[in-house]
Regions:
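Conserved SAM-binding strand-loop segment of SAM-dependent methyltransferases
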Residues: 92-97
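Signature of N6-adenine DNA methyltransferases within the class I
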Residues: 9, 16, 57, 65, ...
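Class I SAM-dependent methyltransferase "Motif I" SAM/SAH-binding loop
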Residues: 1-5
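Conserved SAM-binding loop
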Residues: 60
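Surface-exposed acidic, glycine/proline-enriched linker/cap segments
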Residues: 24-42
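Post-Walker A helix-loop "phosphate-sensing" segment adjacent to the P-loop in P-loop NTPases
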Residues: 17-22
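Conserved SAM/SAH-binding beta-strand->alpha-helix loop
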Residues: 53
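Conserved SAM-binding motif I beta-strand of class I
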Residues: 47-50
Length: 235
C-alpha cells in the first residue's frame, strides 16, 4: 500500500541529500584529477513498494524517476561534470498487487531488507468491504477476535511475520484506535508474546492533516518496531 510513492520518494531524496553531503565533504579542497565517474551508491532500485491501484503504481514509479533525475543534477554540480545517466535504465521496484495477500518475500527477500515504512489504509471493522475483511482474516487468522481490528492492523501482523529472524526495523502511520481499548489486547498481546515484537519508538496521537476538501478528522499515531534486538526505546 505504497500509494503514489510519497514515503518512498521522500526517503530516497533524504538519503541522496545525505550522500551528496558525503561526496561534497570527500571532494572539499581537493583538485579533481580526471573525472569522478561513479560516486553514487543510493539508487531507486533499492526501494520497493506494493500498491493495489495500477494508476498509483505508475505515479510512484514516475515520482521516483523524477527524484532520481533531480538528485543526479545536484551531484553533477558537486563533481563538476555530467554523469552518464538515463532515467529509464533505473528500475523502481513498485509492484502492483494486494499487499496483504502477496508474499513479500517474492517482492524482496527479507535478508536484503533493512527498513519497512508506510501509511497503510485505516478502515474500521464497521466500514470494511467484504474483500478487506477477507484480507485481514487471511493475515490474522490465528488471532482471536481479529475481525474487530482496524484494517491497518493487518500490516503489523504481516510485517511481524515477514521480519522473523531478521534485524529489520519497521514503522507505520496508523489510526490511534490500534493503541486504545479492545484493540490493545487483541493485536498487541500476540505480537509481543508470539512474534516477539518490540516497540522501538512511538509518536503520540496527532490529527492527520490533508488538503482534501471534505477531509475527516483522523487521529493518528506512528509506531516503530522490530522483531530483532533493540537497544533503545523512545516516546
Amino acid at each position: 500500500a505504497c500509494g503514489s510513492g510519497n514515503f518512498l520518494t521522500e526517503t530516497y531524496l533524504s538519503l541522496r541529500r545525505l550522500e551528496n553531503e558525503v561526496i561534497d565533504a570527500l571532494l572539499y579542497g581537493q583538485v579533481i584529477l580526471g573525472q569522478v565517474t561513479d560516486p553514487i551508491r543510493v539508487s531507486i532500485g533499492q526501494f520497493y513498494g506494493i500498491e493495489i491501484n495500477d494508476f498509483a503504481v505508475t505515479v510512484a514509479k514516475t515520482a521516483l524517476w523524477i527524484a532520481e533525475s533531480q538528485m543526479m543534477q545536484e551531484t553533477e554540480k558537486l563533481v563538476r561534470h555530467t554523469l552518464d545517466f538515463l532515467p529509464l535504465r533505473s528500475y523502481a521496484n513498485i509492484v502492483e498487487g494486494n499487499a496483504l495477500q502477496m508474499d513479500w518475500e517474492r517482492v524482496v527477500p527479507k535478508r536484503e531488507l533493512d527498513y519497512i515504512m508506510g501509511n497503510p489504509p485505516f478502515v474500521g471493522h464497521q466500514w470494511r468491504t467484504k474483500e478487506q475483511a477477507v484480507d485481514l482474516e487471511s493475515v490474522c487468522k490465528d488471532i482471536p477476535k481479529c475481525g474487530k481490528l482496524d484494517y491497518v492492523c493487518g500490516w503489523y501482523v504481516k510485517a511481524a511475520d515477514y521480519m522473523q529472524g531478521t534485524q529489520i526495523h519497521a514503522a507505520f502511520v496508523s489510526t490511534n484506535s490500534i493503541s486504545q481499548g479492545e484493540s490493545v489486547g487483541i493485536l498487541w498481546k500476540p505480537l509481543f508474546t508470539e512474534k516477539h515484537l518490540t516497540i522501538e519508538f512511538a509518536y503520540r496521537t496527532f490529527v492527520w492533516t490533508s488538503e482534501a476538501k471534505d477531509k475527516a478528522a483522523v487521529h493518528c499515531v506512528i509506531i516503530g518496531f522490530t522483531c530483532g534486538s533493540s537497544q533503545t526505546t523512545r516516546l
